[in-house]
Regions:
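Glycine-rich phosphate/adenosyl-contacting loop at the front of the ribokinase-like
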Residues: 1-76, 86
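Hydrophobic beta-strand scaffold residues
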Residues: 73, 99, 177-178, 235
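Conserved phosphate-binding/catalytic loop of the ribokinase/pfkB sugar-kinase fold
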Residues: 100-105, 115-161
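Conserved beta-alpha-beta core of the PfkB/ribokinase-like small-molecule kinase fold
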Residues: 150-225, 242-244
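A short, aliphatic-rich alpha-helical micro-motif
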Residues: 144-146, 198-199, 229
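Active-site nucleophile and cofactor-binding loops and adjacent substrate-binding regions
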Residues: 50-58, 103-107, 267-268
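A glycine-rich helix N-cap at a beta->alpha junction
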Residues: 91-108
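Conserved phosphate-binding/catalytic region of the ribokinase-like
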Residues: 3-9, 23-30, 47, 192, ...
Length: 309
């Protein structure tokens, strides 16, 4: 197998709501709220008309993109034996992704992200991790990891104790490790640990400019470049409209992004960028072509609704 992803198996449930629904339920518009009470989450969900249900999760989105580009890819996650779990499984099978899953028959439901779309197209997300947040080292196949060229992980796995053990097992058995820092708040929560991973454990790090700035407490972007040069590892940083940059030792490669796109949804931009870049990387393309493929995939996904092509 070319690449194996390990991450939170989350089903995205999309529903259209009005502004009053956001206010009435004490939600902060255009942000993500993590729910810890299952009953509270289910009460919110049952009052809505579901427009669309699709398999999601950051690393899983990237893995699907890699499979769509023709590479053999797999995913390790945790779902429940329920309707959303079945939807998740079918979503990956449809995209020819090999799924090394653990399916629970009782207890917590499959992880769900409720995406509330207001008339102005803004998205407010409500997430209940459910079974996804319970992935552990026993769910991670050492054999599958050892047979994969690259393991791709998400920083979100550090938010729970058991997933962190799965993360550590993957790193210790992998041939090569790539990781997405996930988001700014995730970096802030785990800064010392992430810094150690970037310096000592990871072969490839994906981050946006804000995440890297926070990670090393940089004052300028040049500080990020200089920090990355010293590591002699591949650091890939996206910069929004400024494009993207890859630093590997003294090699610094940049690329631009397409301008004047009709942007509908930025949700999957980073996930699909990573998919395009890793596709190029595992097929031994020059770094510039890896960056170009990443920006191409990212540009495509932001012009549609949803995080998968």
């Amino acid at each position: 197998m070319k690449i194996l992803g390990i991450g939170n198996a989350i089903v995205d449930v999309i529903s259209k709501v009005d502004e009053n629904f956001i206010i009435k339920n004490n939600l902060t518009k255009s942000t993500m709220k993590l729910f810890f009470d299952e009953n509270e989450f289910q009460n919110l969900l049952k009052n809505l008309k579901i427009e669309k249900t699709v398999s999601g999760g950051s690393v899983a989105n990237s893995i699907v993109g890699i499979s769509q580009l023709g590479d053999k890819a797999g995913f390790i996650g945790k779902i429940s034996d329920d309707e959303f779990g079945s939807n998740y499984e079918e979503g990956l099978k449809k995209e020819n992704v090999e799924y090394f899953y653990s399916k629970k028959k009782e207890g917590l439901p499959t992880g769900t992200c409720l995406i509330l779309v207001t008339p102005d197209s803004e998205r407010t997300m409500c997430t209940f991790l459910g079974t996804a947040g319970k992935i552990n080292e026993n769910d991670v196949s050492s054999d599958a990891i050892k047979k994969s060229e690259i393991i791709f992980l998400e920083g979100y796995l550090w938010d729970e104790g058991e997933p962190k053990k799965a993360f550590d097992k993957a790193i210790n058995n992998a041939n090569k490790v790539a990781m997405s820092l996930s988001d700014l708040f995730c970096v802030d929560r785990h800064k010392p640990h992430f810094l150690n991973l970037v310096k000592n454990k990871l072969d490839i790090t994906f981050a946006n400019e804000q995440e890297m700035t926070s990670l090393i407490e940089a004052k300028t972007f040049d500080e990020i470049i200089n920090f990355s040069k010293q590591l002699n590892k591949l650091i890939v940083v996206t910069r929004g409209e400024k494009g993207a940059i890859a630093i590997n030792g003294n090699e610094v490669v940049e690329c631009d992004v397409k301008k004047n796109l009709k942007i509908l949804d930025l949700t999957g931009a980073g996930d699909l960028f990573a998919a395009g870049f890793l596709h190029g990387y595992i097929n031994k393309l020059p770094i510039k072509e890896c960056l170009d493929k990443g920006t191409e995939m990212s540009s495509r996904v932001i012009q549609q609704i949803g995080a998968r092509l």
